[in-house]
Amino acid sequence: MPPRKPPTVYDVATRAGVSIATVSRVLRSPQKVTESTRERVLAAIDELGYVPNASARGLAGRRTGVLGLLIPGHDAPPIAPPGSAEEHAVEFIDDMDRSFVDPERNHYFEQLVRGCEISAWSSGYALLVASGPDLSRSVVLDDLEGRVDGIIVISRTVPDDLIARSAQRVPLVVVAGRAAGTADSVRVDNAGGMAAVTRHVLARKPSGPVLYLGGPADSPDGVEREEGFRREVDGSGESWRIASTDFTTEGGAREMRRALAEIRPGAVIAANDQSALGALTALSEAGIGVPDDCVVTGFDGIEDARWSQPALTTVRQPMTDVGVQAVQTLLRRMADADAPGQDLQLPVDVLLRESCGPLGR
């Protein structure tokens, strides 16, 4: 029986009932296609198992020498037409406006990418970093399958069912969350790290309730960190409450201001550093001294936490090491596709700084 012919863009167009040009627009510029049409095309791609990169299909059966890393991205800003005044305009931003947040500045991913690059290069591989807006990441993942020998995916970047599907077709490792299906995973001890810093806070905090600034409900890291927090405060006799943030500095400041309208906390434990930095800003605005009136901690170990006023006590994630181990785990999977799945958990450190008071207190 002859081998099954790989599906083509023509097959996708026929299945979806659209033109080839429309399929191309969905793959390259999904925001330019109506939602209903986009869903039909993506459904056809999924049903047929179509890999958009036609040239990459010719590489089947031999190595490319490239590893892929898929990370969350942002919608591209509008591009001014050539020769327009906006092309050379200098923008003035009120940097005292606390609502301004640079979405491109994400220290978490900077360290992770660096670790992946170091490990890939030292192992003789190039690293292809891919990203895209929410609507196109599943297509980007499909495209990566045809371009690389293996893929590293940040948890939540694409739905778990798509990760599980890709793991059946190409070696794949999930970072910052448990893997779906047969994929391997590399993550840190979120619950243990948060439990440790919470114990430290409970032993040193001024009087007042504990406010926990958690993360999004769909964040695996956020869920595990909240578990570690609850493990320590349950039964501690302390009064505590939880507020959810979007893991941004702005979100941390916003939730801190809302909480201050109702309570005067003796401690703020944040699920990430950026939320904690926002909380420091809101506390300062309210005239609440840190650490004398309220202690504050974060989680991640980003460089900005070292230079905040006061310097932020935090749980340091070894994100560079996570990147290194993700690549090494991927290479092991590439060498032995039938090996048992691996869930590697790396330890974290608590960095004690001024936001929790003198170290000897």
Label for each model-derived stretch:
Residues 1-3, 66, 74-199, 259:
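Alpha-helical recognition/docking segments in bacterial nutrient-uptake
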Residues 28, 60, 131, 135, ...:
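Positions that flank functional sites
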